[in-house]
From Swiss-Prot:
GO biological process, alphabetically ordered: lipid metabolic process; negative regulation of transcription by RNA polymerase II; regulation of transcription by RNA polymerase II
Segments traversing the membrane: none
Protein name: Zinc finger protein 202
Domain SCAN box: 46-127
GO MF term set: DNA-binding transcription factor activity, RNA polymerase II-specific; DNA-binding transcription repressor activity, RNA polymerase II-specific; RNA polymerase II cis-regulatory region sequence-specific DNA binding; zinc ion binding
Subunit structure of this chain's protein: Interacts with SDP1.
Species of the source: Homo sapiens
Location of the region described as Disordered in the Swiss-Prot/TrEMBL record: 146-221
Keywords per UniProt: DNA-binding, Isopeptide bond, Metal-binding, Nucleus, Phosphoprotein, Repeat, Repressor, Transcription, Transcription regulation, Ubl conjugation, Zinc, Zinc-finger
Annotated crosslink Glycyl lysine isopeptide (Lys-Gly) (interchain with G-Cter in SUMO2) location: 22, 454, 460, 507, 521
Domain KRAB: 237-308
Record-listed Phosphoserine modification sites: 466
Length: 648
């Protein structure tokens, strides 16, 4: 019976030009949710809207237009009411916020409304928690996702729990066609025997790929699924057919809960199955890779009877030679490039089949397996018995001239220069060439130290008249650091920095008590003792204390002067022998330096030289500005000040 239309809705439809059709009594209108479930086009539009990615569009505007089109194809506003569209959006958002594992299960049940989805989740929460396994089965190029609940130590309550896959075929297929299906590979009377094999397969914990919620277009492959299960029970299926494989993109889309579930339940169960199928895969390695959030992609090849597995073993103790350390520092080679001469070109996989890990602990032996075929591995052959010494552990760069071997290519290139005479490093100042850059750097320091320097205007820059020798102007090699302001050289950079403060006037050391600044830290330390009132140096004889050690030592010498240098004529004491000898010459009037012209005597030789200029008339100090000469240096300096005052 058709539902009566309200007058208000009827007027609205007539204004919008919508054609009204009267339904007959024998026609029943299906609900919109059921229509959506049965219509594969609507489901496809829904999936296209959910899986749309921004990268599929060329521009942001095109992405927005594409989303509007997909949303319109899914929601169909011309056929649904606002309440129905709102219910679909709420249901989609509810499924999105569910946890990953629970979301996949609820979507597989295809709830028609939000209330039905809530009922499914509440019913699942009331059931006891049991681990589930997800298996991806490849059947003629198609992937079939199946979920199986693992019953730990519990037998099925009835044989009906293991349903015959033949009975789950499409309803349109008759029993006769199912019996004579060529995909089964067995007549109908052999079905009980197949059921026994399938029951044995269930007890051995081999996951049975069942999924009642697969799309309708895949239902035609149920017969292929039965053939697959039959072959699996007979041991004709390899691990690749029942492997749980994830690509890099699929693994990055999983949340931490799904990755933990995959590592705890799927790998622990599936690896056990693989071992039972004679696949020697160590289970902890793959599980540790999964828990470190790295997808494990197995590489399994079909077993070949005529080909022996190429399996190599490499043992490394962790110790490295000196040549090996230099090679690792100078050559940026990956492990794959290093081992390619021995192992050949590896196949391209997401996870390489060969790998070497150098342990930090030299006491532990680290062994890794090499090869591509792991389906028939029963024993490993030592690499040292089948291949020569590894290149990393020996010398493999040979000189073609003399035959000498080197561990690194850079060492060989440097050695070849001895044969060719090549000197690629050239000095830009003098043109001299060197074979090594270190030799050139050492040579350039000589140019920097011997560079000519023009001294300021003082008694040192009087080259024409001053008796300053070239040896005094050229610093020794032991003082390579020169001051750019005055040309003075220093042996250490710290001395140069301390000296430069005399030119800049910098005083980086401040007294926190009075704020006074100093150029050297030692002076600041001495100054701070004034504020603290500390005089740590106390004289043991007279009780006088001193704040500086040098003054304390000078005071100590005064007490010991009687025993050192005491003048017997006047009683004066002297701490130094030179001062005492000069004092004695005064008493004896001894002047060993005598002038041959006038007979005048002098106690010092420099005084005699200066006196002799009065006889010879020599004036060695000449003014470079006016040419006037003087007999003494300080006379010239006093004269030059007159020139500087005139220019200013």
């Amino acid at each position: 019976m058709a539902t009566a239309v309200e007058p208000e809705d009827q007027d609205l439809w007539e204004e919008e030009g919508i054609l009204m059709v009267k339904l007959e009594d024998d026609f029943t209108c299906r609900p919109e949710s059921v229509l959506q479930r049965d219509d594969p086009v609507l489901e496809t539009s829904h999936q296209n809207f959910r899986r749309f990615r921004y990268q599929e569009a060329a521009s942001p505007r095109e992405a927005l237009i594409r989303l509007r089109e997909l949303c319109h194809q899914w929601l169909r506003p011309e056929r649904r009411t606002k309440e129905q569209i709102l219910e679909l959006l709420v249901l989609e958002q509810f499924l999105t916020v569910l946890p990953g594992e629970l979301q996949s299960w609820v979507r597989g049940q295809r709830p028609e409304s939000g209330e039905e989805a809530v009922t499914l989740v509440e019913g699942l929460q009331k059931q006891p928690r049991r681990p589930r396994r997800w298996v991806t089965v490849h059947v003629h190029g198609q992937e079939v996702l199946s979920e199986e609940t693992v019953h730990l130590g519990v037998e099925p309550e009835s044989p009906n729990e293991l349903q015959d896959p033949v009975q789950s075929s499409t309803p349109e297929q008759s029993p006769e066609e199912t019996t004579q299906s060529p995909d089964l590979g067995a007549p109908a009377e052999q079905r009980p025997h197949q059921e026994e094999e399938l029951q044995t397969l269930q007890e051995s914990e081999v996951p049975v790929p069942e999924d009642p919620d697969l799309p309708a277009e895949r239902s035609s492959g149920d017969s292929e699924m039965v053939a697959l299960l039959t072959a699996l029970s007979q041991g004709l299926v390899t691990f690749k057919d029942v492997a749980v494989c994830f690509s890099q993109d699929q693994w990055s889309d999983l949340d931490p809960t799904q990755k933990e579930f995959y590592g705890e339940y799927v790998l622990e169960e599936d690896c056990g199955i693989v071992v039972s199928l004679s696949f020697p895969i160590p289970r902890p390695d793959e599980i540790s890779q999964v828990r470190e959030e790295e997808p494990w992609v197995p590489d399994i090849q079909e077993p070949q009877e005529t080909q022996e597995p190429e399996i190599l073993s490499f043992t490394y103790t962790g110790d490295r030679s000196k040549d090996e350390e230099e090679c690792l520092e100078q050559e940026d080679l990956s492990l794959e490039d290093i081992h390619r001469p021995v192992l050949g070109e590896p196949e391209i996989h997401q996870t390489p089949d060969w790998e070497i890990v150098f342990e930090d602990n030299p006491g532990r032996l680290n062994e890794r397996r090499f090869g591509t075929n792991i389906s028939q591995v029963n024993s490993f052959v030592n690499l040292r018995e089948t291949t020569p010494v590894h290149p990393l552990l020996g010398r493999h760069h040979d000189c073609s001239v003399c035959g000498k071997s080197f561990t690194c290519n850079s060492h060989l290139v440097r050695h070849l220069r001895t044969h060719t005479g090549e000197k690629p490093y050239k000095c830009m100042e003098c043109g001299k060439s060197y074979t090594r850059s270190s030799h050139l750097a050492r040579h350039q320091k000589v140019h920097k130290m011997n560079a000519p320097y023009k001294y300021p205007l003082n008694r040192k820059n009087l080259e024409e008249t001053s008796p300053v020798t070239q040896a005094e102007r050229t610093p020794s090699v032991e003082k390579p650091y020169r001051c750019d302001d005055c040309g003075k050289h220093f042996r250490w950079t710290s001395d140069l920095v301390r000296h430069q403060r005399t030119h800049t006037g910098e005083k980086p050391f401040f007294c926190t008590i009075c704020g006074k600044s100093f150029s050297q830290k030692s002076v600041l330390t001495t100054h701070q003792r004034i504020h603290l009132g500390g005089k740590p140096y106390l004289c043991g004889e007279c009780g006088e204390d001193f704040s500086e050690h040098r003054r304390y030592l000078a005071h100590r010498k005064t007490h010991a002067a009687e025993e050192l240098y005491l003048c017997s004529e006047c009683g004066r004491c002297f701490t130094h022998s030179a001062a005492f000898a000069k004092h004695l010459r005064g008493h004896a009037s001894v002047r060993p330096c005598r002038c041959n012209e006038c007979g005048k005597s002098f106690s010092r030789r420099d005084h005699l030289v200066r006196h002799q200029r009065t006889h010879t008339g020599e004036k060695p100090f000449t003014c470079p500005t006016c040419g006037k000469s003087f007999s003494r240096g300080y006379h010239l300096i006093r004269h030059q000040r007159t020139h500087s005052e005139k220019t200013s």
